[in-house]
Curated annotation (Swiss-Prot):
Protein's name in the database: High-affinity zinc uptake system protein ZnuA
Superkingdom in the source lineage: Bacteria
Record-level GO BP terms: zinc ion transport
Signal peptide: 1-23
Binding-site residues for Zn(2+), renumbered to this chain: E60, H61, H168, H232
Natural source organism: Brucella suis biovar 1 (strain 1330)
Region feature (Disordered): 120-147
GO cellular component assignments: periplasmic space
Function text: Part of the ATP-binding cassette (ABC) transport system ZnuABC involved in zinc import. Binds zinc with high affinity and specificity and delivers it to the membrane permease for translocation into the cytoplasm. Required for survival and normal growth under low Zn (2+) concentrations. Also required for virulence and intracellular growth in host cells.
GO molecular function, one term: metal ion binding
Length: 334
């Protein structure tokens, strides 16, 4: 009897495997990076859990796809990522392994506040690999009031004007709210049975992010006008939302070490502006930051745009935003 039961379970497993993989059926949700995975997780609560590609302290700038990642992409029904200019390591795998899945570049979500890359002076020139013109002109230095941000609401996910826009859009919690609604819509179309649950979750998460936005704005108000330097220019969405003032970045690409002239330029900028803090990131060696602040009165801190040390899941994203605020306030208020 026991052997018969084991045989039945084995047969059922094989039948399920053949019915999905061999028949080409897709199931499950895959997300590229931790902040976006957190928002998707919140929308999917009570229904399922998405698969995360870049885990732990990994960075989308230098990540190499693992066999388990490739397998997840191959069988995914829905794939969420920021877009081809952010997670370049996913370009080819999505085109090949992801063929047949619904692939959603969240950088194209309707209604997002989108900001152009900052260039010139303390902000090093960017390489617009996927460049393309846009119908509207936007403020390239959107680190002030929200009115300076570009509200782009084009045609959903069909267009890919990533080259001129900064894709760290999730660092504005109000963008996070828009993403949650967009994700709920996408999941509801792929899984109509749970569409109402996705919508309910997204609404609740949006309300949570509204409260978080108010909380962070109040916390940062005393240090809004204090200049600081960041490791790479990833934070202008956060700055724009909360009226912060980055004076420059050490490098535009974390995987590309700046030259001696660039380091000297930032060093001089710190001295001339009296920049209070220079921030590193946990994904990369802090040696450059130490070199830049040497001989100045600037302190050092850590800003994490990905939630490297946070536990994956729906709570990661709000905690990431809160941690950015805490790190800025702690360093700038000393």
């Amino acid at each position: 009897m026991k052997n018969l039961h084991s045989l039945f379970l084995a047969s059922a497993f094989l039948a399920g495997f053949c019915g999905s993989s061999l028949a080409g059926e897709r199931e499950g949700v895959v997300v590229s990076i931790k902040p976006l995975h957190s928002i998707v997780s919140a929308v999917m609560q009570g229904v399922g859990k998405p698969k995360l590609i870049v885990q732990g302290a990994g960075s989308e700038h230098v990540y190499s796809l693992k066999p388990s990642d490739a397998e997840a992409i191959e069988h995914a029904k829905v794939i969420f990522w920021a877009g081809p200019s952010m997670e370049t390591f996913l370009d080819k795998p999505i085109d090949t392994l992801g063929e047949g899945a619904k692939v959603v570049a969240l950088g194209d979500a309707k209604g997002l506040t989108k900001l152009k890359f900052r260039e010139g002076g303390p902000f090093e020139a960017h390489d617009h690999g996927h460049g393309g013109s846009h119908e509207e002109e936007h403020d390239a230095h959107g680190s002030g009031d929200h009115d300076h941000a570009a509200e782009v609401a084009e045609e959903g996910h069909e267009h890919h004007h990533h080259g001129e826009y900064d894709l760290h859009f999730w660092l504005d919690p109000q963008n996070g709210k828009i993403l949650a609604a967009d994700i709920a819509k996408t999941l509801g179309e792929s899984d109509p049975e749970h569409a109402a649950q996705y919508e309910k979750n997204a609404k609740a998460y949006g309300e949570k992010l509204d409260a978080l936005t108010r909380e962070v704005a109040a916390e940062l108000k005393p240090v809004k006008d204090k200049p600081f330097i960041v490791f790479h220019d990833a934070y202008q969405y956060f700055e724009n939302r909360f009226g912060m003032k980055a004076a420059g970045s050490i490098t535009v690409s974390p995987e590309k070490a700046p030259g001696a002239a660039r380091i000297q330029q930032i060093h001089d900028k710190i001295k001339s502006l009296g920049a209070t803090c220079v921030f590193s990131e946990p994904q990369f060696e802090p040696k450059l930051v130490k070199t830049v602040v040497d001989g100045t009165k600037a302190r050092t801190g850590v800003l994490d745009p990905l939630g490297a040390e946070l536990k994956d899941g729906p709570d990661l994203y709000p905690q990431l935003i809160r941690n950015l605020a805490n790190s800025l306030k702690d360093c700038l208020s000393k």
